[in-house]
A protein has these predicted regions:
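Extracytoplasmic cell-surface/polysaccharide-interacting catalytic and binding patches
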Residues: 1-47, 142-161
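Amphipathic alpha-helical interface surfaces
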Residues: 38-42, 52, 65, 81, ...
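Generic non-transmembrane alpha-helical segments
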Residues: 41-50, 98-102
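Structural recognition of the beta-strand scaffold that forms the well-ordered cores
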Residues: 55-57, 82-86, 124-126
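Short, flexible, solvent-exposed loop/turn segments with mixed acidic/basic and small polar residues
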Residues: 68-78, 113-116
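Acidic, His- and aromatic-enriched active-site or binding-groove loops in soluble protein domains
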Residues: 73-93
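Catalytic cores and adjacent binding grooves of peptidoglycan-active enzymes
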Residues: 87-161
Length: 161
């Protein structure tokens, strides 16, 4: 099932953990609508900006899958409202800064950020619905959450260093 021009449902439901443990990871119609909203409001604009394919590393998670990986059943992933992703060759911090400045989102987290490894970690972004997004921005280093994104040096719209 095609969710948007560049994204298919399978990209959001595939899970090695679900496969290994025999967990059904199938979203309902409301979850699928939410995934489409994430595509249109977050992923398609990001893909257009950076002109590169996006790799979805985690999308929809059933409650059983959330439990199996130690995530909360109330996670926005369980509602189809969140996505974790990367863009090969683009520092995750650059993607996060662009989303913060240009997209309507509920929560944006630069996950497992390491300033010495710009390709490390990933971007988590969620979308709730127009008018109810919190615009919460966090950085997670693997131990604790900090408000906002790290300060970076920029030149010509690119992260320096």
């Amino acid at each position: 099932m095609q969710l948007s021009k560049h994204f298919k449902l399978i990209e959001f439901t595939k899970s090695m953990t679900a496969t290994r443990k025999g967990i059904k990871n199938e979203p309902g119609s409301g979850d699928i609508k939410n995934l489409g909203d994430v595509c249109y409001e977050i992923l398609e604009p990001v893909r257009a900006k950076f002109e590169k394919p996006i790799t979805v590393t985690s999308g929809y998670r059933s409650e059983a899958l959330c439990e199996a990986i130690g995530s909360k059943k109330t996670s926005q992933h369980a509602k189809g409202q969140a996505v974790d992703f990367e863009i090969s060759g683009v520092p995750n911090i650059q993607v996060a800064y662009w989303i913060q400045a240009n997209c309507d989102f509920d929560q944006l987290i630069l996950e497992f950020y390491d300033p010495d490894d710009p390709a490390g970690g990933w971007v988590h972004c969620s979308y709730s619905e127009k008018g109810s997004n919190r615009k919460q921005v966090l950085t997670y280093d693997g131990k604790s959450y900090e408000d906002g994104l790290p300060d970076m040096e920029w030149k010509d719209g690119q992260v320096v260093g």
